[in-house]
Every structure is written in structure tokens, then in C-alpha cells.
């Protein structure tokens, strides 16, 4: 199982920006859409905080596999720190959702509904972070190194299977880090939608 920092580093790292886009395209578009990935992070977060997983609804394999693919996004995102911001007046639906989601929305309604934007648009990023997702990613890696974020995510994946609490008063820090991971996922997705050469 690719569960340690060293083994994941070998298997999941991206050598350059193009490889990062290949990884993001696979994880965030081929496997499932962004809203599903946010739910998967939420499932791991719930397991960490509640210490009781309903394995009839959530299999151990799904937690492990989802966690590994999110690791790939974390590794890829290190290459996404230098993209330009978009001006507020030029921001459109094509800057927020990939063509597959846009097509799904069009099938649901000829006009873009506010509910569709709420369902498929970014939920965790601030307005400034939506306009400049690279700035968020840069701040993410200024807060902690890639190695520390990887270790943190692997720790969360492990804790999802614990039956007893290991918080020791760190709940606030854990919640903040889960929010950061959700934001990183959304920021990486926005850069993929706007700038992918694939």
C-alpha cells in the first residue's frame, strides 16, 4: 500500500507543470468531478472527528483509494503557484467549471441557474481566492512545506480508522487544515479549468 511519505513521494510526485496537469486532469475530471472530491474529503474529515465509520456505507478501500488520489492532487499543486489572476469583470462560468460540468448544467437548464453555481462552483474559496487561486496555493505552501502537508494528510487518512480520539485539544487546528485541503482542491481545479494545456 502506498501509504508512507517516502513511497508516495516516488509514486505520486510530478516533475513539472505538464505532469501536474496530466495528474489533475485524471483525478479531477476522469475519475470523478470536483463536488465528489470535496465530499470524499468531508467523509475522511467526518471519520477523523467522529471515530465511528459506517463501513456499510463507506468501505475502507474507498477511504484509502480516495485519500491516495487526493495525495496526487497535493503533489501536483506545488507546480501551480505562478498563474495570473482573473479580473472580476471578466470572470465567467468557463472560469469556474470544466466543459463536462457546463454541459451537465445546460442539460438541466438552458440558462445558468444560481442553484447550479452553488452546486458546482467553489464553496470554500473566498472571492479573492477564486480570482487568484495561485495566490492561495502559494500561501498554502508558505504556511507549511509540501513534505509537512503530505505527512499531515497521511496522518488524517490513518486517523480515519481510529476508534479513540487523538485530538488532545487540537480540534481547531485539524478543522483548519481540512479546510485548507478543500481549498487546495478547489484552487487546483480552477487552475486546471483555466490553464490546462491538455
Please place each PLM-identified region on the residue numbering.
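Sequence/structural signature of long amphipathic alpha-helices
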Residues: 1-198
Amino acid at each position: 500500500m502506498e501509504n508512507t511519505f517516502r513511497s508516495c513521494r516516488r509514486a505520486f510526485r510530478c516533475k513539472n507543470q505538464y505532469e501536474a496537469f496530466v495528474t489533475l486532469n485524471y483525478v479531477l475530471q476522469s475519475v470523478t468531478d470536483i463536488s465528489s472530491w470535496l465530499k470524499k474529503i468531508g467523509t475522511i474529515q467526518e471519520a477523523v472527528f467522529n471515530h465511528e465509520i459506517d463501513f456499510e456505507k463507506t468501505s475502507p478501500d474507498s477511504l484509502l483509494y480516495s485519500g491516495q488520489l487526493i495525495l496526487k492532487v497535493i503533489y501536483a499543486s506545488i507546480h501551480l503557484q505562478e498563474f495570473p489572476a482573473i479580473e472580476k469583470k471578466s470572470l465567467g462560468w468557463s472560469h469556474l467549471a470544466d466543459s463536462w460540468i457546463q454541459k451537465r448544467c445546460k442539460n438541466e437548464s438552458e440558462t445558468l441557474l444560481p442553484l447550479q453555481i452553488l452546486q458546482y462552483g467553489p464553496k470554500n474559496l473566498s472571492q479573492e481566492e477564486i480570482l487568484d487561486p495561485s495566490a492561495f496555493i502559494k500561501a498554502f505552501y508558505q504556511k507549511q512545506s509540501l513534505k509537512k502537508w503530505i505527512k499531515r494528510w497521511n496522518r488524517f487518512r490513518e486517523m480515519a480508522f481510529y476508534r479513540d480520539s487523538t485530538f488532545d485539544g487540537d480540534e481547531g487546528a485539524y478543522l483548519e487544515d481540512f479546510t485548507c485541503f478543500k481549498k487546495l482542491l478547489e484552487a487546483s481545479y480552477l487552475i486546471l479549468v483555466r490553464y490546462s494545456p491538455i
